[in-house]
Amino acid sequence: ECSFENFELRYYDERLRPTMRKVVESSQRYVREFGGQSQSLLFTGAPGLGKTHLSLAIAEGVAKAGHLVMYVSAPHLMDQLELGKFQKDDAALEFREVIFGCDLLVIDDLGTELVTRYTQAEVYDLVNHRLNTGKPTIINTNLGLQEIERTYSSRVYSRLAGMYAAVQFKGRDIRLQKKQEGYR
């Protein structure tokens, strides 16, 4: 289970710990103050640095406060949106409504889905719709902002760079560190 309590700062280099401590504290504050004006967040950085862990902790805290939260991987999100659009699958159409309307949406691993013109358009539509309706989104990605612009579009880049609070995760892969220590 991913929580704020088991987010271990010891895996970050001493130079990075104060910054990561602030990221955790800001994330806890985000949960406490979650509401109509909450900002969207963009967690960027290499794999294994805690982006998913921290976004799951935020999602759980916001859900426990009674808000509707959806947590979905980018590949699953795109598969479901495509099913709803092209096969008119009822469950996928309902999924789309929830994704566009939930109080907080967390998209994990943006950039790992098969990127096509369709997925580029869907990412833009989803990001734009949620911004226009004041619905916050947290996006985790291994891509940097320039890679996002190249992969999706300048319109997606502009919205993420200009309207999301970007948080860059740095350090050594925590999963690999844990494996070296004998954790699974």
Locate the predicted segments by residue:
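Short glycine-rich substrate-engagement loop in P-loop NTPases that contacts/grips substrate
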Residues: E14-V24, E60-G101
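Loop/turn-to-beta-strand initiation segments
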Residues: H67-L68, G101-L105, T133-I139
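Walker A/P-loop nucleotide-binding motif
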Residues: G35-S55
